[in-house]
Amino acid sequence: MAAPRLPQLPPHDGPMLSVVDMHTGGEPLRIVLSGAPAPEGRTILEKRRWVRENADWLRKVLMFEPRGHRDMYGALLVPGDEEEANIGVLFMHNEGYSTMCGHAIVALGRFAVDYGLVNAAQGPETAVNIQCPCGLIRAYVSYTGGRSGSVRFRSVPAFAFATDVTVDVPGYGKVVVDIAYGGAFYAFVSAETFGLDVCSSRTRDLVDVSAAVTESVKAQVKLNHPDSDDLAFLYGTILTDGKDSYSEEPTANICIFAESQVDRSPTGSGVTARIALQYHKGLIQLEQIRTFKSGATGSLFTGKAVKETLCGNFKAVVVEVSGQAYYTGASSFVIENKDSLKDGFLLK
């Protein structure tokens, strides 16, 4: 019997984009291999700005239907501008471009090792320095028997921006939230405030509440970041189970970010921010490991504060987050010029 032939596309016009797909805790990551324009700019924030203003078609083509879906997440690899960086990355989603994404870092750590983007891999861990728009992230990829595995990474300085902030949320009244930064800014509030449970309530109800909180915080709270105004925006709202005091038992949360996008993982940058918040409140100590459970899939990350530092005038911590990513496939996408839906679309 002859070996099966790999599927081949017939002749077509328009560009072709090659990608590798992975997931971390159920949250997808689509990594662009080829076909994307080379972003202009000296710094990674300038490259992010250039892509947003000049090549947003790439995000829409790969994230939106019919090639993606409204909860797809992507990564475009770019040269880093820091000497220590092995790779740089721009993150993309249904609304635009993030500054940090922990689940993507876990996946990209494996990817960088497996695709030879770092020096020869060696056990028990191989270091991968990934420059994100928020700064340099140091990832450590377990490596045994020629196979990459779990990944841990150390965050940029994470801090509590404001605690016990009262915002008026239409339809819900006055709601008290905390705001923290873990590479991106999040609002945190217990789902119990709204009579919901992060693990058992309908996803639609969790999304509606989170979206309302996000819009209210955006309208009523001015954020700032010591390093750049490009970092000073609210990425989303994380609903928690309210179990913030230290425990060996997992604590659950669910993150609704960007344009009501639901994170299937426990949210790496959200775990970072939540650890920083718990440390700020004196609920945990350095090196105390907490386990975080996704309310969407039940997948787990672990996190701990490893050292104190500063971010401008904010007292901050460096947080270590650990997780596992898996490959799901590799694809080539085409854009046929006569296709009226070639640019992508989203259903709401």
UniProtKB/Swiss-Prot annotation:
Gene3D superfamilies: Diaminopimelate Epimerase, Chain A, domain 1. InterPro entries: Pro_racemase_fam (IPR008794). The keyword Transit peptide does not apply. It holds the Pfam family Pro_racemase. In contrast to the T.cruzi proline racemase enzyme, lacks the conserved Cys at position 267 which is replaced by a Thr residue, transforming the racemase activity into dehydratase activity. Catalyzes the dehydration of trans-3-hydroxy-L-proline to delta-1-pyrroline-2-carboxylate (Pyr2C). This is Trans-L-3-hydroxyproline dehydratase.
